[in-house]
Each structure stands twice: as structure tokens, then as C-alpha cells.
């Protein structure tokens, strides 16, 4: 439920702040849609920048006039006011189709990034649509870029957008505005925490992130 998402997200933020985080990036479309307002109200008054992620709908719509754009996301993301407000901004410029993808996150978190089961799932998802008429697909969940190549196989030549790059740019901008941007020339350190805290899940996280 939305209430559970807000509660879990706040617990995650507190966990990271206890370990010295200077800013929070909510790298989850569902958590951003449901909880970002509450997070900003609570933590930005403590001088902690909170950056959310949004589906890359704007570049997908503006790439071609009167295009047909499919937004793949979790059912909860697509049902939230935040997403539908953004959709309303662009609905006169493109035919925007919401595609809920129940179960896709669970496939990815189970390590299923390719194979016949995933292939069949994606085929069923796109079955109701005339693929040749789709101009762009927006990946409205941060899990989905991990299976971008598999999605592309079902839609050869179709542009696929995700919000990761825009979120990275916004994070740099906010850190600069707040005087928190590191002046280090070298790269940072990556630490992975997982709520299940089991080695197989941590290993899967490293594999998914190419670490």
C-alpha cells in the first residue's frame, strides 16, 4: 500500500543518514511517486537534499510530433497522482499509453534478465499493441533498464528512454547548489546494503550493477 511504501522508504533514508549520507536519491519510481513529498518535508528542513526519479516522458514525447509513447511501470506508479499529473502535461502532444507490468520487478530481482520465461512475459505485454506504431518506450521503473536489451528485441528500432541520466544531472545540480559536491578528482566508493542482508542477494545486487 502507499502507506507501507512511505514507511519503508523513511526507514531506508534513516538507515543511510545514520551511515553518513549527505543527500538522498530515491532511485525508485514507485517510492518517488508515493513518498517524495513526505521525504522532502521531513528531511530538507534538516538540510538533506532529496532527489527523486521520474519517467523520461518529456524527451520521449518531444522526440517526434504526435508520437505513440508506451510507459512501462509498476501498477502503483501508474496509479499515483504524481505520474498522472505529468502525463496530463504531455497528453495533447502524444498518444501516451500506460502499460502496467506486474511481476516484472520480481523476475529481475530473481536474476532473470533473459530467457524464455522473460521473453514470453514481454511478448504478452506487447501483444495488445501494434508494435509498428510504437514510436518510443519509457522505462518507468529503475529495474527495467536491466532488461532493456530484451525489451528492444521485441521492439527493434523503437527508441527506449529511462530517467537515470536526468536524475544523475539533477543530483549533481542539487549538490552544487547546497555546497555538497565533492571536489575529489577520483571516483567515489560504492557500498551495497540490502534489507534481506543475505549473501546471495548481495551477490545478485553486485551482478546487476556490474560491480
Predicted regions: what is each one?
Residues 1-211:
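Non-catalytic structural scaffold of enzyme domains
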Amino acid at each position: 500500500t502507499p502507506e507501507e511504501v512511505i514507511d519503508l522508504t523513511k526507514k531506508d533514508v534513516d538507515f543511510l543518514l545514520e551511515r553518513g549520507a549527505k543527500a538522498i536519491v530515491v532511485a525508485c519510481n514507485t517510492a518517488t511517486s508515493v513518498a517524495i513529498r513526505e521525504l522532502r518535508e521531513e528531511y530538507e528542513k534538516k538540510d538533506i537534499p532529496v532527489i527523486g526519479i521520474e519517467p523520461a516522458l518529456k524527451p520521449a514525447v518531444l522526440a517526434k510530433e504526435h508520437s505513440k509513447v508506451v510507459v512501462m511501470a509498476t501498477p502503483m506508479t501508474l496509479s499515483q497522482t504524481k505520474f498522472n499529473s505529468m502525463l496530463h502535461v504531455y497528453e495533447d502532444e502524444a498518444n501516451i499509453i500506460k502499460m502496467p507490468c506486474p511481476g516484472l520487478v520480481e523476475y529481475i530481482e530473481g536474476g532473470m534478465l533473459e530467457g524464455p520465461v522473460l521473453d514470453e512475459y514481454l511478448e504478452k505485454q506487447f501483444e495488445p499493441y501494434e508494435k509498428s506504431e510504437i514510436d518510443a518506450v519509457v522505462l518507468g521503473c529503475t529495474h527495467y533498464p536491466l532488461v532493456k536489451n530484451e525489451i528492444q528485441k521485441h521492439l527493434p528500432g523503437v527508441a527506449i528512454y529511462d530517467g537515470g541520466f536526468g536524475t544523475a544531472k539533477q543530483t549533481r545540480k542539487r549538490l552544487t547548489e547546497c555546497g555538497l559536491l565533492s571536489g575529489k578528482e577520483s571516483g567515489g566508493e560504492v557500498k551495497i546494503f540490502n534489507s534481506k542482508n543475505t549473501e546471495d542477494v548481495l551477490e545478485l545486487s553486485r551482478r546487476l550493477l556490474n560491480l
